[in-house]
Structures are given as C-alpha cells and as structure tokens.
Amino acid sequence: MHTEIEITEDQLAIDWTLTDTDLQFIKNNSNQNIKFATQMCYLRAYGRFVSKDDVIPYAALSYLARQLDQTFSSAPVFSQDHHSYTQREKIRTYLGYTAFSNKEALQLGEWLVSQLRKEILDKKQLIEMAMTYLKSCRIVLPSLITLGRVVSQKVNQAIEGFHCSIAETLAPSLRANLHHLITPEHKEAYAQLAELRTSPQNANSEVMNKYLDYFEEIEQLGILDCNLSAIHPDVIRELAQKGRYYDAVQLRDMASKVKQEAIIICFLHETAKTILDYIVFLFKRILLDTNRRAKNEISAEREKVSRKNKGKFKPASDFIKSAFSQAAVKELTLGQFVTQFNEATLLETASACEAIDKLESSGVTDHIVNRFSYIRQFSKRFLTLKLSASTGLASLLKSIELLRKLHAGDIKKLPEDVPTDFLPKMWKDVITDENGQVRAHHWEMGLYYALKKEISAGDLYLSKSRNNRYFWDTVYGELPWEQEREQQYLKLKLPNEFDTMMEVLSGEYHQVATHACNTLPTNDFVTIKDGTFHFTKDDALVIPPEVVQLRKLIQSRMPKVRIEKLLAEASRLSGCLEGFTPFYEPEKTVKFPLKPLLAAILAHATNIGLFGMGSSAIGISIDTLTHASHVYLRPETIKETNRRLVNHFLTYPIAEEMTDGLYSTSDAQRYPMERKFYLSSYYPRYYGYYEKAISIYTHVSRGGVFGTQVISTGEREAPFVLTGLLENDTLLNPEFHSTDTHGFTEHLFAMLYLLGFPFHPRLKDLAEQNIYKIDKMMSYGDLDEVFSGTIDIELIRANWDQIVRIVASLKNGLAPAHVIIQKLANRTDNVSKAIRAFGRIIKSIYILRYIADQELRHTVHLHLNHGESRHQLAKKLFFLNRGAFKTSDYEEIMNKASCLSLVSNAVLVWNTHHIQKIVDSLRAEGCDIQSEHLQKISPLMFKHIQIYGTYHFEDI
C-alpha cells in the first residue's frame, strides 16, 4: 500500500528548506542529490527515512530540485541495499539522530510506563505519542510493526497490573462468589450476569422490586465497598464495557482468572450506578403516573358530579342573592325568609357544593392515598437506600428516619410533633383530620412526593449513583474550581466581572427593543392585544418556483440505487468503516466482516432485525450477522463511523453551497413501542391512549446527524438540546442552534449563550412567552404593556462566578448535560434563579429581534425544514412493522436509532457525491444555478433509493 503524505507550505518552509551547510553536506556525500536530500528532509520532518511504500509529493521534490539547481523527470526510487544504508547512516549522523537499538527500546519502554501511569491505554494514541517522543529525542523511528509490538507489550503488562489491583480490592472469600454470576443454574437458564445487563421494561412495583433485588445482590457481593480510587475511571469504564459485551461462556473460558474477576468487578461497580439510576427513575415515574391517574380520575368524577347536579346550583345562587337583597332592607325575619325556598332543593344543592368542594380541595390527594398499599410494596425498600441530603433538609432526613423506624416496627405510630414543613403545598393542606391530628397515610405519601422533588433538584441524593448525586458534586468542586477558575474563564471567553458582559447586553437589548418598538406600527407579523403578542399572519417560508423546478431537475438525474449498494459505496468513499473495531483484542488477525457488518447496520436501520435480514439477504447468514452486530456495533464505534461520514461529506464543494453551516437544529421523532419499556409513555397527539411511544432526539447540521438520543415522550426535550451540541465530535461547527417552541427553557437560553451557541428557536406560542425589562425606568412605547417585569440584575451579578462554574462543568463533561439542566429546572436556590434571570435577558432580546426581523424568522424556518427532511428520510428507512420498536432493551433500541442515523448520513454522502456531479454538469451545459437556490434544497432526497425487497450483498 502506497502512502502519500500531504505537505503544507509551512512544512515545506520549515523541514524541506536546505541551508548552505545542508547543500554542502549533500554535495560532499552523494551524486544523486535529490534522492539524498529527500531522505535527509524526510528524517528531519518525520523522524524516519523514506520507505518503499512512501510516495513523496511532487511539490516537495520540485522544491528540493529548485534549491539544488537540478531537474528531475521521475521520482527517485528508495531501496534497502548496502549503499543506501551507508547514505542513511551519514544523514543520521549529520542530523544528530540515534539508531533505534536495544538501548533505545529500553528507553522507549520506560517512557511508555510513565505514560501508562497516567492511565493512557489507547494503543493508537500511545503509538502516535511514542513517535513524537522518539522524534524529540532524535531517535530514528523503527517500523510501525516494531513500534506497535513494543507499545502492545507495555500496555498488556500495565493492563495485567490493573487487573490484579482491581481483583485485590475484593476480599478472597467474596471473589469466589463472582463465578456464580457467570454460571447458569441449569442448562437452559441464562447466567445471572446477563440479567444485570437488562433495562427496565415498565414502571411498576414489580419491576421496582426486581431492580432493588439486583442492587442488593451487588451490595452483598461487597462491590460497593471496593476501593477503586487508585484506578483511573476510564480503565474502570473500559473493563465494565467488556463485561457488558462478553457473554458468560467467554468470561468462564478466560485463561486469566484475574482478568475475569477484574472485568466482573468493574462491570458490577458501574452497573450498580446504573441500577440506582433506574431505581430513582422508576420511583419518580410511578409517583408521576399515580398523580396523573388521580388527576384524570378527579376530572372524570367532576364531570359526573356536574352532570348529576345539572341545574341544582341555581337555587343556591337565588338563595344567596335574595338573602343579601332582603337583609339590606330588613323586610323579613330569618324564619320568614327561609320558608320562601324548598328545603329539599336547597339540601340537594348543598350536597352538590360539598361534593365539588371535596373534589377540588382534597380529591387528588385522596385518590393518591387510595394507592397507598401499592406504593408501600416498594417504598419500604426504597427508603433502605443510603439517602443523603444537603444541610437545608434536616427535617426531611429526620422524617425519613422516623418512617424507617415505623416500617421496621421500632415505633408503633408517628409522634404528634412529626415534621411537616418539608411537605409540598398540596399535601400540607390535607395533612390533618377534623380533630387536628396528622393523618399518617397522607403524611407518608406527602413525604414520598417531597423525596421526588428534592431528588430531582439534586439536594437529596444517592452518592453511589451516576446521575442522582448531590447537585454540587456534578460540577467542579470548590477546590478544583479555585485551581481551574482563571483558565476556564479564558477558555469560555467570559469576563471575570458580570458588569463587563452586562454592558454589552444592555446595549444590544436597548437596540433591539427600540427597533421592535419603532417598527411595531408597520409590523404585519405580530400585534399587541390584551398585553400579549399575537400573530397576525402565517410567516411560513415560501419556496420560489425556481427552487422547486431545480429540485425536480436534480432528482430526475439522480441514479437509481439499492440501499445496500448505497451504503457500501458511501462507506468506500468515506472510509468510515475503519471506525468499527471489535470490543475485544483478537489473539490473531481476523478478516474484517464487511458484508455481514453492512447487513447488520441495515438490519437495525430498517427495523428488519437480524433474523429478518438473514432471511431477506443473499450471501449473508444469520450467524455472521449476529456476530458482526455483537462484536462491532457499539455506541462508540457507531459514533466514530458517523463522524467519518459527516467529515467526508464536508469535503465536497457542493456541501458548502447547499447547506449553511452556521446553524444546527434538534428535534424529536416519535416511534410506537410494541413492548413494555421504562421510557415509553402515551403520546395522544399521534397514538391516542392505546399505544405508547418513545422519542428519538437527533441533532442535525447541513443534513448530517451528529447526535442521537433515546428519550421519553413524557419528558421535556429542552435538557437534551445541550447534550448533543457538547458531544459533537465532527467538523461541523454551528454558531447558532434552533429547535421548535417546546425545545427551550430560560435555563437553556442562558447555558447555550454562555457556551457559545446562541439559541434561535421557532416561536409558535408567542402569546405565552414572557419578556422582561432590564431597566424598569426605560420606556419602549407600546411594548411596555407586554413586559412581565424587570430582571434582577443584582442577583446575576452576585452569583456570576457560580454560574460560570456550572457552565465550565458542562463544557468539560463533568456530568451529562441533560442531568445538570434537569436539576437546575427543579432547584430554587439563588444560583438557579440567577441562571433563569440571565436566560430571561437572552430570551427577551431574541423575542424582540424575532418579531421584527423577517429574515431571521425565515432562516430559522429554513433550517428546521432541513431537519424535517431528515425526519422524512428516517421514516422512509425505518419502515418495517410500521416503524414500531419490538424490543424493550435500551441498548438494542439505541443501536437501531444510531444505525438509522448512520444510514441517513450514508445517504447524505452518496447523494452529495452525485449532486456534485449533476450540478457541475448542469453548469457546464450553461444552466445558471444560484447558490441561494441550492440552499433551499435538502440533499436528503430519497425517491431514487430502493429500500424494499431482497438485499444483495454477494457482489459487494
């Protein structure tokens, strides 16, 4: 394989420029000056000599020839004969390089050990670092095979040391129990370890207790007491991942017992965190569902009472009005007055009023308490978890301890002075009976809802979990922040003092508010009515006829292609399949399973499934499909493959013309679920109350998908906006981000702005949006009646450093972005309020600009339309079984969603490759194709793609 190295002009000037001394040295030592000079410059530039497989760029040879005042007709040939060796030795000595011998190998080994102590275990990364190190030491690089062998040897030794260290954290008596996890009880059974890999199928008491059992089993094994602090978290995560992918047979058959134990320990260590997060999610979800069910039941009862008592409320109204009018003139005694009305009718009216009042005042809580015995099926065990709390929740912790004693039988009833200050308002109103005594069941249910609230805010927490830790443990700690503060402010390009930023924002606010005020009389988009904005027209983006015609013309010239051929060709064009690596390091070189891997990707992306693809594909067996899927398809490998596809797409000139890289968008696409799944929920808008669904939330820029997340349709989308943007590892570099209206909160406006992604959502519910002044003394004419208040600037100023601390934590991935955003939304401390206040500044500026700037609105609509084009393609690809998921396993769902994004990106690459040819051809024919028209055409057209039928992999 021949390798041509790209050389920039700067590299030519630095490494390929010959000094007078160089020229004299070349003249004195060689007759073949260009060949000799090339070897010398190559060693200087890359730390090694030219090999027979290297191709020297013409620019470098031409540059050397000019300096040597010579000409050349062909590239020199570099051989390995004795004369060439002598020449290389002269060059090595002249440049002060040392040959790579045993001494240098030992030196490299010592250096590698120093890097391994820093927990750098990636062999590719270490090889690149070793090459840089050897060059800095002026040691001639050995062959890649030799270098790889040295690195592998040291890495394997280090990993073996880690295995021993990890295994020794567990007592020998407990280590023996690990073997039971990978040994089935009988031939047909699954090993217990396999059960721990599953995700919850539903949110109910049975599933809750099942996962509490799992956690207790891990706890009893002593895993939570293992001190792994000396092991780098990346090492633990890597070994834990192997525990997820190795099956029980592979683990049992491992030659190294220590490696087996280390993998299982790390897997259990990380799985315990996941299970705790599942338990908390289920706890909150069950309470949420119970509350929702109670509200629905109350709504139905309210309608029933209203129908039953139709017309019975008027007598009460007449009675009251008459009482006040006659009392005013003192015409009748009370007895005379009452006899004017029918007693039975009034009593019926009173009963109806009492029924309505009971429903409104305590109906929801009474219905929730009716589920008390159901909640008790798991709540006792939930309270045995090691819950901790911030200093302000002392009474809640005291109440938890009281309830634990009550559950254990240590006390018979709640004390009279039981704390109630922590209860949510709806429970405080109903906590006592008519005698003023605390109602135990109401108090206990109120406590559970208080737990839900405080866990969501991160003030009540489980320190052993991953996402439900103390809020301030998910961001920079106080000491690390003191050390990092100065550097992080510089990296974020944020001022140390808030007043510096406020000066800029004040000027921008005044400018856009003044412009919005001045243009309001002629604004045909919105008007002000009853103190709120109202749309006066549909401001949808109009696509010119020329664009429609051009789209049809390009579509008509697109070659017909089957989806499997498209995927194979896009993979070849981009080299993306190099991103797929096996989850284990094979003992010997294995052939890359190209066809089975392509078929497995399509099986997931089309929802056909592996067995379905095995039946529909020619040249592929089900065994090879399942092997390729299990060994190669993982979140990190699919993400890497997607990265390569997107980056290749950006190399086409037409990509710059057709797509505006300034914007990215994100949106959720709903898919029905045929199996029970803990993230699924009803989505009446599309599926009524008969079928549950989940959302696949994707981030798109220039048509390329760079983020894929599986979320619940019952959750707000806003927290997941930031996750995709911060985890983007492609060359896409959007400056603005857009979503639909439901995709934002004031916290999100603040965080996106401070992280360098100004937020431009589409506003559909403008009348429901509040905007605020930053200076209550300023007047903006007719706009004054829509302002909801004045932003507390002093609050932001006082908490500015803490705000930046959270922003820096998000930027550096200290915790998943959606976790921090969700906690912020539930917190009521001053820092959270300050972030919300800052978000109100940014949101107010944006809304005022949005209503007055038609070009901004159309730009936002255009990019969201491109995102919608990707949704249409995804719907077309994911066709089987009505696009419904038939699995309840989170990883399988995530694999399907990620492979769908991968194939979508493959379509983008393939289409762009051919659109480039078509547009070039049309322009050569004299067609005037404007870039502004191309930008209104999505490259994700798919009419030419054949998706259904038999899949032919035999000739790929």
Where in the sequence are the language-model features?
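Short, basic/hydrophobic alpha-helical segments
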Residues: 716-735
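Acidic, metal-coordinating catalytic cores used for nucleic-acid/nucleotide bond scission
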Residues: 737-747, 765-770
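Electropositive nucleic-acid engagement tracts
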Residues: 585-589, 605-663
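Long, compositionally biased intrinsically disordered regions
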Residues: 785-956
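Structured, charged N-terminal subsegments at the starts of enzyme catalytic cores
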Residues: 507-616
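Short, conserved catalytic/metal-binding motifs centered on acidic residues
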Residues: 47, 613, 664-670, 737-742
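Active-site cores of enzymes that catalyze phosphoryl transfer or operate on phosphate-rich substrates
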Residues: 569, 573, 577-579, 589, ...
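Long amphipathic alpha-helical coiled-coil/heptad-repeat bundle
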Residues: 2-503
